[in-house]
Amino acid sequence: MTDNNIENNEEEIRKAPSANDREELTELKAQIEELKDKLIRTTAEIDNTRKRLEKARDEAKDYAIATFAKELLNVSDNLARALAHTPAKLDVEVINIIEGVQMTKDELDKIFHKHHIEEIKPEIGSMFDYNLHNAISQIDNTKYAPNSVITVMQSGYKIKDRLLRPATVQVTKKPKQEE
């Protein structure tokens, strides 16, 4: 009887899968394909999220000091103004004060450079760039092309590629023709 059972089992194994089995197999294959697709999409979504978070982290790190840096810009401007207006007659005490102000300005400039803060100081005669400059007035001028920077009132600054403060400038305009 044991041999008989073995023969029966072999016959069952040799039999072609039934329609039910084929249906079940087709369903299982479809489920496998669906799960593979979900896995691929989930993996891609995780990768995109990781990249987005890395970019946000890098931007936060790069621009975290922007607000603080904006507040220091006026300090830098005031130090530069103080150095630009040194008296003609200098005694030892005034020279020492000027040297101290210069050292402070130099140190602040080093810190700006360390944190990728660049001064925007347009050349006289260069074209006005609304991305970097703020024009406060237009002046008749024939020496330079219209919309050229004629006066820099205040330097601008940027941190990496982000503008902290535009340079304040006066630009030329084409003079009116006399009739």
Swiss-Prot record:
Keywords, sorted A to Z: Chaperone, Cytoplasm, Stress response
InterPro entries assigned to the protein according to its UniProt record, in alphabetical order: GrpE, GrpE_coiled_coil, GrpE_head
Cell compartments where the protein resides: Cytoplasm
Record GO biological process: protein folding; protein import into mitochondrial matrix
Main location: cytoplasm
Sequence segments annotated as region (Disordered): 1-22
Subunit structure comment from the entry: Homodimer.
Family classification: Belongs to the GrpE family.
Function: Participates actively in the response to hyperosmotic and heat shock by preventing the aggregation of stress-denatured proteins, in association with DnaK and GrpE. It is the nucleotide exchange factor for DnaK and may function as a thermosensor. Unfolded proteins bind initially to DnaJ; upon interaction with the DnaJ-bound protein, DnaK hydrolyzes its bound ATP, resulting in the formation of a stable complex. GrpE releases ADP from DnaK; ATP binding to DnaK triggers the release of the substrate protein, thus completing the reaction cycle.
Full protein name: Protein GrpE
Organism: Rickettsia canadensis (strain McKiel)
